C-alpha cells in the first residue's frame, strides 16, 4: 500500500464500504498479529531508548534527543506544538461541520468518519473553488516538475543539470551532472521517482557520497526517491499538486547535500540537527507556488498550453483549505512522539493503549487519524532518526515560512542577494555553526511564528 494510491482512492471512490476497507488496511499496518505485528518490538525499542538516556545522565529519551537540537528541550518543542494544536483543532472542527453538512445535503444518514473525510473534502473543494484533482493533474507532468525544480535552483543558485547516461541500480532511476554557474562539477544527482514493490512508502533523500575536503575535493552523489504512480507505457506521469510539492521538498533536501561546502564529512550537507534539517526542503516548496513557476511549467500534457489563469488562481486560493485537518493529522503525531519518548519508565508498555489514551487526553477529533500511527511510524522506528524529533517538521516550518517572507519582503521571490545569503548560511554551511546563529546570519533575526500561522490559515483562529 502506497500513500499516493491509497489517498487518491479515498478522495475519489464513491463506494463508502470500499473506502472504509482501504482505510482500515492502511491505518492498521503493523498491528494485525503474526510476524508483521510491530507493537512488541516498538515497546522494546522505546524502553531501551529510555535506558540509554538514563545511562547518559538524562531523565528521558526526549531530553537526551533534544539536548543538541535547535529546540534544546522537550518543553520548548511542546510549547510550539501546543500553540498550533488548539488553533488547528478549532479550524478542523469548522471543516468537519462543513463536511457533515455536505453529507446531509446528499442524503447521507451517517456521521462523518475518517474514511469519509478526503472524499467529501474533494467534493467541497470542487464546489467551493470549482476545482478537482482530475482537472489539476493534466497540468502537472512529472517531467515538467523536474524541470521546474531544476530551473528554480538555476535562478537561485546558478546551477544547471546535464543528463548523464550511466549504469544505475534500476531502469527507472535517472542521473544528472550538476554544474555551477562557471560550468564546474558540483554533484551527481539521481532521481528514482516511481513506486515499486521493493520500495517502502514515502519519499526521501539520501546521500551515496557526502561532500568533504578532508581527503581531497570530494563531491557528493545525492539520490531522491519517491513513490509516484508509474504511468502506462507511452503515457506521461501525471502528479497531484501534493505530489509536485513532495518533489520540490525532496529536491530541497538534495540541494542541501549537493551545495555543501565544508571540510569535515561529519558536518557535511544534511548532517544538521533534525529540527533544522527540514528548513531547506520545506522552504524549497514555496517556489513551486510562485505564480511565475506555475505559469511556466504547469502545462497541459496534451496541448502544451499553460494552466489558465483562472484555474491557477483557484488552485492557489486553496492553500489554506483543509489546513485544520492537515495540521491536526501532523501535530497529533508530533505530540504523541514527544509524549512517548518522555516516559520516565517505559517497561511493560502497551503501544496501542498508550496511543489511544494519549490521543484522548489531547482531545483528538474522532474524524481524524494520526498521519502515522505508532505501529507503522517509520520516522520513529525504522532507524529512529526522528525519534522524539517528529516535531521538527513544524519547528522547521516556522523557519521556512519566516525565511520565505524574507524573499517576499524584497518584492522578488528570486532576489539574488537574499539567495546568496541563503546559500552561504543554510544550503552550503552544513553543521558549521549553531542553527540559531546560522538562521540569524541569513535573516538578521530569529524567526517568529506569525508567518507559519498565516501560511496555514490559523492566524485569526481562536484555540479550541
Label for each model-derived stretch:
Residues 1, 43, 48, 52-227, ...:
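Active-site-proximal, well-structured secondary-structure segments within enzyme catalytic domains
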Residues 1-64, 148, 184, 359, ...:
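Noncatalytic, helix-rich "gating/capping" subdomain that lines the substrate-entry/channel surface
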Residues 8-9, 73-74, 231-236, 265:
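Short small-residue beta-strand/loop micro-motif enriched in glycine and branched aliphatics
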Residues 26, 227-230:
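Short, histidine-centered active-site or binding-site loop motifs used for metal coordination
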Residues 34-37, 80, 243, 388:
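Non-transmembrane, amphipathic alpha-helical segments
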Residues 127-129, 144, 148-162, 167-170, ...:
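C-terminal, non-catalytic "cap/extension" segments appended to globular domains
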Residues 222, 241, 256:
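Acidic/His-rich structured neighborhood in mature extracellular/periplasmic domains
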Residues 229-248:
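Short pre-active-site segment immediately N-terminal to the catalytic Zn-binding motif
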Amino acid at each position: 500500500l502506497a500513500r499516493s494510491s491509497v489517498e487518491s482512492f479515498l478522495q475519489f471512490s464513491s463506494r463508502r464500504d470500499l473506502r472504509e476497507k482501504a482505510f482500515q488496511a492502511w491505518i492498521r499496518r503493523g498491528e494485525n498479529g503474526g510476524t508483521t505485528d510491530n507493537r512488541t518490538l516498538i515497546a522494546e525499542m522505546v524502553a531501551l531508548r529510555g535506558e540509554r538516556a538514563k545511562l547518559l545522565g538524562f531523565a528521558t529519551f526526549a531530553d537526551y534527543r533534544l539536548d543538541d537540537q535547535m529546540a534544546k528541550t522537550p518543553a520548548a518543542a511542546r510549547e510550539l506544538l501546543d500553540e498550533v494544536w488548539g488553533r488547528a483543532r478549532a479550524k478542523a472542527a469548522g471543516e468537519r461541520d462543513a463536511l457533515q453538512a455536505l453529507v446531509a445535503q446528499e442524503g447521507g444518514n451517517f456521521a462523518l468518519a475518517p474514511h469519509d473525510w478526503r472524499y467529501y473534502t474533494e467534493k467541497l473543494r470542487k464546489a467551493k473553488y470549482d476545482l478537482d484533482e482530475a482537472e489539476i493533474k493534466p497540468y502537472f507532468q512529472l517531467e515538467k516538475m523536474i524541470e521546474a525544480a531544476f530551473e528554480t535552483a538555476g535562478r537561485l543558485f546558478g546551477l544547471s543539470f546535464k543528463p548523464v547516461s550511466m549504469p544505475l541500480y534500476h531502469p527507472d532511476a535517472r542521473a544528472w551532472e550538476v554544474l555551477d554557474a562557471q560550468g564546474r562539477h558540483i554533484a551527481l544527482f539521481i532521481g528514482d521517482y516511481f513506486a515499486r514493490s521493493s520500495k517502502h512508502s514515502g519519499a526521501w533523500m539520501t546521500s551515496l557520497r557526502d561532500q568533504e575536503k578532508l581527503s581531497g575535493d570530494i563531491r557528493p552523489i545525492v539520490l531522491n526517491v519517491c513513490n509516484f504512480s508509474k504511468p502506462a507505457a507511452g503515457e506521461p506521469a501525471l502528479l497531484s499538486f501534493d505530489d509536485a510539492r513532495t518533489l520540490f521538498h525532496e529536491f530541497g533536501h538534495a540541494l542541501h547535500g549537493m551545495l555543501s561546502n565544508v571540510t569535515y564529512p561529519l558536518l557535511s550537507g544534511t548532517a544538521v540537527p533534525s529540527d533544522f534539517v527540514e528548513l531547506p526542503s520545506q522552504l524549497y516548496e514555496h517556489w513551486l507556488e510562485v505564480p511565475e513557476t506555475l505559469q511556466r511549467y504547469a502545462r497541459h500534457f496534451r496541448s502544451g498550453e499553460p494552466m489558465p489563469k483562472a484555474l491557477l488562481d483557484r488552485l492557489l486560493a486553496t492553500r489554506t483549505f483543509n489546513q485544520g485537518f492537515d495540521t491536526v493529522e501532523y501535530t497529533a503525531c508530533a505530540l504523541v512522539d514527544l509524549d512517548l519518548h518522555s516516559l520516565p519508565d517505559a517497561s511493560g508498555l502497551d503501544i496501542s493503549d498508550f496511543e489511544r489514551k494519549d490521543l484522548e487526553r489531547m482531545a483528538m477529533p474522532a474524524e481524524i487519524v494520526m498521519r502515522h500511527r505508532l505501529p507503522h511510524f517509520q520516522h520513529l522506528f525504522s532507524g529512529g532518526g526522528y525519534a522524539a524529533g517528529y516535531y521538527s517538521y513544524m519547528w522547521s516550518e516556522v523557519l521556512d515560512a519566516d525565511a520565505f517572507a524574507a524573499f517576499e519582503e524584497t518584492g522578488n521571490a528570486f532576489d539574488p542577494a537574499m539567495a546568496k545569503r541563503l546559500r552561504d548560511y543554510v544550503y552550503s554551511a552544513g553543521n558549521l555553526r549553531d542553527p540559531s546563529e546560522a538562521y540569524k546570519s541569513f535573516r538578521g533575526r530569529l524567526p517568529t511564528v506569525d508567518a507559519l500561522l498565516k501560511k496555514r490559515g490559523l492566524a485569526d483562529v481562536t484555540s479550541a
